[in-house]
Amino acid sequence: LKTRQLLLLIALDDERNTFHPRLWNDADDCIDLADPRGRDGQPVAPHIQHERISQLWFAGVHSNVGGGYPDDGLAHVALGWIMDQAELNGLRLEPQIRDELHALADENAPIYDSRHGLGGYYRYNPRRIEALVRLNKLRIGPVKVHESVMRRIRAGQRAHAAVEQLL
């Protein structure tokens, strides 16, 4: 079985050197993507042929996006996006459970300080998105930021410096 589509969720606000992301592109030798056409030559999911690798930046630090903090509202925003993408790819989710998880999403939930407590032992290195793209010699097109990041900004929440440059 080969992967038809890769989804990468990236924490926009994490500034720990150890947690800098490894961005992907179709040219990566280590990524073996399946042909987006099914056995009959028809697209398995029509949108996959347009975007086989989807990388999306979400508000928060590593555990805000992936979960693990007491207020997991931001993690549920990210989980909601994953569930939506999975359904677009043909995965059937239990509607009641999907709706309950979507209801837990809070795009204005707090962004935790990843350098607090034991996290303070990690090296601090502010994330420069454009430098990450250049460093990895990626051809990923425009950087994609989840719409919840923009809604946070409109609601008066702080924004990552790289996003503020886009405004």
Predicted regions and their residues:
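Active-site- or binding-pocket-proximal scaffold segments within functional domains
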Residues: 1-167
